[in-house]
């Protein structure tokens, strides 16, 4: 099993933590990670685009002129697509772009991105992130003590609200729970800052 250093909030190394090789030590599957990232990005699209077809455009209920005898082409409505101000043919309608991938694929993608961060030495383990109250300055001190000055994803245990509130005003810092972190979140981060309890949760969820 791989070992990573375990730090406290002051940046002091206090111990080490063993990581499960089946989760943090596999050969990353880039193809699967790519598929999951595309899927998650598709799910983020709003899909609220809409145009009016001939039935939705106001007016046009009356036949503009009689069928025969005028010498002009026959017309049934001034809201037909060929008319100026008429309806749009085959235009976009509100829809969801999201689609689901098999659970095994999503789990393999998570294991792959976690393993990649560990292999690249971009996985920082911390004993805990406890704050008496939400304080942005206190969280900034923790990041400074751990020499983290890049885009970071902080993974905390469920119920650690003060950590999330303390970090939300800091640029380039995202906080998520270990059970809900997505592949897209992890890929977008330069480093992972993970609490000891969060590591246990990750291993419990993915094992």
Swiss-Prot record:
Region Disordered, annotated ranges: 49-78
Any matching Pfam family: Ribosomal_L4
MF terms in GO: rRNA binding; structural constituent of ribosome
Keyword rRNA-binding: yes
GO cellular component: ribonucleoprotein complex; ribosome
Gene3D superfamilies in the cross-refs: 3.40.1370.10
Disulfide bonds: none
Entry annotated with the keyword Membrane: no
Keywords tagged on the record: Ribonucleoprotein, Ribosomal protein, RNA-binding, rRNA-binding
Residues passing through the membrane, by range: none
GO biological process, one term: translation
Family in the record: Belongs to the universal ribosomal protein uL4 family.
NCBIfam families from the UniProt entry: rplD_bact
Subunit structure, interactors included: Part of the 50S ribosomal subunit.
Function: One of the primary rRNA binding proteins, this protein initially binds near the 5'-end of the 23S rRNA. It is important during the early stages of 50S assembly. It makes multiple contacts with different domains of the 23S rRNA in the assembled 50S subunit and ribosome. Forms part of the polypeptide exit tunnel.
Protein's name according to its UniProt entry: Large ribosomal subunit protein uL4
The organism of origin for this protein: Streptococcus pyogenes serotype M3 (strain ATCC BAA-595 / MGAS315)
Gene for this chain: rplD
